[in-house]
């Protein structure tokens, strides 16, 4: 799950086709959980610098269920789409924060999205 999400979020940042995977189609369905108009507000609330990736912990939004976990993935993907170049961003911190927030739901996410762990 970690590798899939890393590749997906990096792909959303720059659409590098070498990162594309057919599993991304299901992850892209999560986009409907976050309005495009909200992305600018979310970025502002994250107080990011030019080299930051999505810093979800700064949103103060708890992850209490699988739907919250899906929303965090969607937020990460949409913020990644709208921020700077991949090579300029410190992704490691962003992924550490995301995974810490949603790791409890990894198995449930895989079953919900793909029908298996």
UniProtKB/Swiss-Prot annotation:
Q: What Gene3D superfamilies does the entry give?
A: dsDNA poxvirus
Recount the UniProt induction comment for this entry.
Answer: Expressed in the early phase of the viral replicative cycle.
Please name the InterPro entries in this protein's record.
Answer: Orthopox_N1 (IPR009353), Poxvirus_Bcl-2-like (IPR022819), Poxvirus_sf (IPR043018)
For this entry, list what GO says about its biological process.
Answer: symbiont-mediated perturbation of host apoptosis; symbiont-mediated perturbation of host defense response; symbiont-mediated suppression of host NF-kappaB cascade
Q: Which UniProt keywords apply?
A: Early protein, Host-virus interaction, Inhibition of host NF-kappa-B by virus, Modulation of host cell apoptosis by virus, Viral immunoevasion
Q: What's one Pfam family here?
A: Poxv_Bcl-2-like
Molecular function (GO) terms for this protein are: identical protein binding
What family does the Swiss-Prot or TrEMBL record give for this protein? Belongs to the poxviridae OPG035 family.
Protein's job: Bcl-2-like protein which contributes to virulence by preventing host NF-kappa-B activation in response to pro-inflammatory stimuli such as TNF-alpha or IL1B.
Name of this chain's protein: Protein OPG035
Q: What is the native source organism of this protein?
A: Vaccinia virus (strain Western Reserve) (VACV)
This chain is encoded by the gene named OPG035
């Amino acid at each position: 799950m970690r590798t899939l999400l890393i590749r997906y979020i990096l792909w959303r940042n720059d659409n590098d086709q070498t990162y594309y995977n057919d599993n991304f189609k299901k992850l892209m369905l999560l986009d409907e959980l976050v309005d495009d108009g909200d992305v600018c507000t979310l970025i502002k609330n994250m107080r990011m610098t030019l080299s930051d990736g999505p810093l979800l912990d700064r949103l103060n939004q708890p992850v209490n269920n699988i739907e919250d976990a899906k929303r965090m993935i969607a937020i990460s993907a949409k913020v990644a789409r709208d921020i700077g170049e991949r090579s300029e961003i410190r992704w490691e911190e962003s992924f550490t924060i995301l995974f810490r927030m949603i790791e409890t739901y990894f198995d449930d996410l895989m079953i919900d999205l793909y029908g298996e762990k």
